[in-house]
A protein has these predicted regions:
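A conserved acidic beta->alpha catalytic loop
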Residues: 35-49, 65
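The conserved acidic donor/metal-binding loop of glycosyltransferases
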Residues: 91-95
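Short, well-formed alpha-helical segments that are part of the catalytic scaffolds
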Residues: 9-34
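Short aromatic/hydrophobic "clamp" motif used to bind/position activated sugar donors
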Residues: 87
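Extreme N-terminal starter segment of soluble prokaryotic enzymes
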Residues: 2-6
Length: 114
């Protein structure tokens, strides 16, 4: 059975780079949890544009502001919402090289563990 992968993208004010970050993994993962923590820039607009283009792959949530204590709770909620075998953390300004994401996905899909 093929292993499935979710990308966790928990962001705030990453409108300048987040499109590139998500696009760098979108064709290699089954789902992207794209949660915004109170952006005041164009991050949410970018998220909705990506969701329009990939409606079944993007789960966008306006999570709301987090602080040092509640950041870990948001991450845990992302884990709880993940229904795939694996997940990767994707920062809002993290752009994967094609070869790198292909290598990671290959390792995941060829691993014996779930």
């Amino acid at each position: 059975m093929e292993k499935t992968i979710t990308a966790h993208c928990l962001v705030k004010n990453e409108g300048r780079f987040v499109w590139y970050a998500v696009m760098s993994v979108i064709n290699h993962v089954n789902k992207v949890l794209f949660w915004d923590t109170g952006s005041t820039d164009k991050t949410q607009e970018v998220a909705w544009e990506i969701k329009k283009a990939f409606p079944t792959k993007i789960d966008f949530l306006e999570y709301g502001p987090v602080d040092v204590q509640t950041f870990t709770k948001a991450r845990q909620k992302m884990l709880d919402a993940t229904n795939t075998d694996w997940f990767i953390v994707l920062d809002g300004d993290e752009i994967w090289w094609e070869e790198s994401i292909e290598q990671v996905v290959h390792l995941i899909k060829s691993s014996k563990g779930g």
